[in-house]
Amino acid sequence: MRILKTIILSVFLGIGLAAFADPVLRINFITPSIVRVQWSNDGSLQENNTGACVYTNQSVKVEKTENGDEIIFQSSELTIKYSKTNNGIIFEDKDKNIILNQIPNSLKAEPSVQEKIIYDEKSAHVEETANGKVTVKDIIRRDTIGRSTRYYVSFSSLNEKALYGLGSHMEDYLNLVGKTLYLTQHNLKAMLPMLCSTNGYGLLFDAGCAMKFKNDGSITTMQLEGAKTLDYYFIKGARLDDVVAGYRYLTGEVSLMPRYLFGYTQSKERYVSSDDIINTLKEYRRRHVPIDMIVQDWNYWPEGWGYMKMNPKYYPSPKALADSVHSLNAKLMVSIWPNPQWCPEAEDFKNRGMMLEHDVYDVFNPEARKHYWSYAKNEFYSQGFDAWWCDSSEPLDGDWNRIPSHSLKDENKPYGWDDQEYRWQLNKDVLSEALGVERSSLYSLYHSMGIYENQRAEAGNTKRVVNLTRSTYAGQQRYGTVVWNGDTHASWKSFRQQIPSGLNYMATGNPYWTVDVGSFFTRGDGRRWFYKGEFPEGVKDENYREYYVRMFQWGTFLPMLRSHGSDTPREIWRFGEPGTQYYDAILKMINLRYEHIPYLYSLAAMQSKGSYTMARLLAFNFPEDDNVLDMKDEYMFGDFLVCPVTQPIKESATRKVYLPKGAQWIDYWTGKTEEGGKWIECKSEISTLPLYVKAGSIIPTTEVAEYAAAQIGKPVTINIYPGADCDFTIYEDEGDNYNYEKGAFASIPLNWNDKKNTLIIGQRQGSFDGMLNTRTFIVKTPKGEKKITYKGQKTTIKF
């Protein structure tokens, strides 16, 4: 083994910095509780330049000592011990308790090559896929066109019970201890290399390549497929919220979504004309069913593929369409794609040298991002469209299309077999070929950056950026994105897998995640690994109606409630009429969602102004309860304990629910209080799902309205769920602009004293245009309710 020569560069301006030459390692205190570790085998420490991190180094007081083989760095929160002989690093808390070990001699590097696939042009043909029309060719050979370095590093943490994060994946994992996860961008994978532990730390790996995570129960190994430098951040955090706070310090704050996003969004594949969209909205309004946004999916273009131009035959005036939607008090989202083909837009990008391999625009070029925005602006933004659906932001896949027959193990599986490692290899190869191995996972981050920065740069912009997208990376939370989990198939098994997928994604510090309620594919063909829907009759099948309702109940308690999919329509009247069980169950959930918009919007502000996460795996709140560490089908949504029903009633008319210990729980539907730390059996009636509120919670609600803006000025009910002292802050602003960044918002603190049965409504802080100076609050407890007029001054209400 090679012993590294130790060179102490400096401990200056309070920043601890140590480096070692050939290979070279650097340890850098970013804050007293965040440490950056970089290692390279070639004597240099080049930046990976992912664009993920935007922090400013704090001036950290660090003491350096040496003890034989060890070099020791100590801040007010951490002690770092580095071994000169074996590259081991020990991370300790301020009381000298070991949090994490970078295992000695685990740093490894080996050559990594970037290949260009050479295709047989004579075999080229166009196929329809779930991602649109694609040109498919047979592979002749692979040529090496670039080189990088593959890195390995391993860690151990004593008695580690749970690991979470790494993005949204469909392997049916929550707790990642003992698991292997293949990380790349994909239709059904949103990779984000942030790992969180209940042992009080997080790790952010800052490299733009594909990765592999493996934990054997005691040792975690990360494999980075191609990077200039192994670069990771150690984040100390006593609880998961503290780890999230560290992640957001490094990568940026969460954008505050507009208020309307917390209403209901209706989508499907697809509305075929302006009239189709307008008539659908009119039907919602006729039925008085709340809705805030409707979505135009793909194939609105007149020619080619992905052309940001509406076909005048079916969409004669984009502005008239947007105006009509707005006249119905709704917002309009449109699907845009990064891969224009066979159209003037594609030729324009090619002529400007702004296209990468596989006909995706060069998102890493700022001028190309600006040019892409010019198309989106001219056809949509300038015409009044409100929100973006940046589809296919991976932006390529290698396992969604037909695979050449000579590479198949099974000729009956023309799209390959459902093997995670095999599919990871296919996808990382095609992404590396087009984007480069060192940035194969970064496309969505830069695509989102382009939409966000260019919209915000528009003169007179009054709309918050909303970007529904399918891929992600660290730092994307600052660009107004909501990630959804891709083109899922409708089966109860798939439903169950989706819940932990979202919880792990949101545990990374990126809180906005959603699904296609009802799942994308309802049909299946038995041949394609992804096309496995089990309800070919769609809404005609009562079994699918039940499935849809159960997913809708779950989606009600996600940051964005959105119905979408292929094969069958999704509007509420497709599931029955008023008075029938499925229609009424859907309407009940929509109404419940709208009642709670004051609560949801306040939670959103907590996310944007701090470390909070709205939808939370149970270890956020109850890390000491071992029963919840791998609880895949329950989670917290604010102070709600949400327990989706994930099997048909014919299999079971009840649903077992675990109530975490450390709290009492109040049944939302009945008001009955239960002690925590036990399992109970709940009825799984189609009209509801098991839903509990933590005793000691304040939940503000308001009257149901047909759209979120119509609720402004309505009385707000302050619901007290007693059992413990608690507080909450109601947040309000103008709802859909960035004036809140300049201080244009108001907050109203609420404090409940449980022993005294007293609520204190504190003095309102701040103001904004349109703020209600006088308003009605209804304070509701199990002992009764009181109606008060609030004028911004401290008010005490005793029961």
Which residue ranges define each predicted feature?
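Conserved, mostly hydrophobic/aromatic
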Residues: 27, 194, 284, 325, ...
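Extended Gly/Ser/Thr-rich low-complexity repeat segments
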Residues: 31, 45-56, 81-95, 104, ...
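Catalytic and substrate-binding clefts that recognize carbohydrates or anionic sugar/phosphate headgroups
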Residues: 66-258, 268-270, 274, 281-286, ...
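Short, well-ordered beta-strand segments enriched in hydrophobic/aromatic residues
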Residues: 27, 37-39, 73, 77, ...
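Catalytic core of carbohydrate-active enzymes
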Residues: 452-460, 464-465, 472-482, 505-515, ...
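Aromatic- and carboxylate-enriched substrate-binding clefts and catalytic-loop regions
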Residues: 101, 290-586, 621-622, 637
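Bacterial Sec-dependent N-terminal signal peptides
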Residues: 1-22
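A low-complexity, Ser/Thr/Gly/Pro-enriched, surface-exposed linker/loop concept
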Residues: 28-73, 109-111
